[in-house]
Amino acid sequence: IKIMDILAKLGKVLAHV
């Protein structure tokens, strides 16, 4: 797992909210 992957997931979650 790379930092970019985590940021991408967080970005999607935040965008969903």
Swiss-Prot record:
Keyword terms: Amidation, G-protein coupled receptor impairing toxin, Mast cell degranulation, Secreted, Toxin
Cellular compartments per GO CC: extracellular region
Location of Valine amide modifications: V17
Places the protein is found: Secreted
Keyword Secreted: yes
Tissue specificity field: Expressed by the venom gland.
Pfam families: Bombolitin (PF08096)
Entry-linked InterPro entries: Bombolitin (IPR012534)
GO molecular function: toxin activity
Stated family: Belongs to the MCD family. Bombolitin subfamily.
Free-text function comment from the UniProt entry: Mast cell degranulating peptide. Its mast cell degranulation activity may be related to the activation of G-protein coupled receptors in mast cells as well as interaction with other proteins located in cell endosomal membranes in the mast cells.
Protein name: Bombolitin-3
Taxonomic path: Eukaryota, Metazoa, Ecdysozoa, Arthropoda, Hexapoda
